[in-house]
Amino acid sequence: VMSRENKHFSGPLLLKVVQEAGLVHGEMGLFHYHLAGKDEPLFSVANILEPGRFELSEIATLQTPGLALFMRLPAVVSGEQALQILLQKSRQIAAQLSGSLCDEQRMRLTDEKLAELEHKARRYTAS
C-alpha cells in the first residue's frame, strides 16, 4: 500500500487504520493479522522504510510512504483463502489511508499481476 503523489502516511492515522482492520502490533515490531483462535499470523505489515518495524513509542511522529503486506504459505487456510483475506484487508487499509494497492515493484496492482498471485496461491492447501 503506497501513498499517492509522493505523500506520506502519518503514524497516528496508520495505527488507527490497521487496528480497525484487525491487526495487532507484535513480534519484530510489525502488525499482524490473526484468524480467530490461531496463534500464527495469516499475514503481517511492515514499514517500507528500513528497518521495517513500527515503534509504538515513536508512532506519533512516524511518516512513511508505504506499507508492505506479506504472508507465508502454506497457512492455516488455503492459499486462495489467505490471499483473498490479505487482498480484502489491503484494499480496506489503502482506501482508509487514501493510498494505492501496489505490487512488489511499487507499481499499481494490475489484473495480470493479481491473476499471477492467485495462480501461485492455488498451489497451497491449508496446513
Where are these regions (language model features)?
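Short, highly charged
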Residues: 1-59
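Short flexible coil/turn linkers enriched for glycine and charged/polar residues
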Residues: 37, 62-64, 93
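Active-site-adjacent structural patch at catalytic or cofactor/ligand-binding sites
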Residues: 43-50, 61-75, 88
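Well-ordered alpha/beta subsegment
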Residues: 68-127
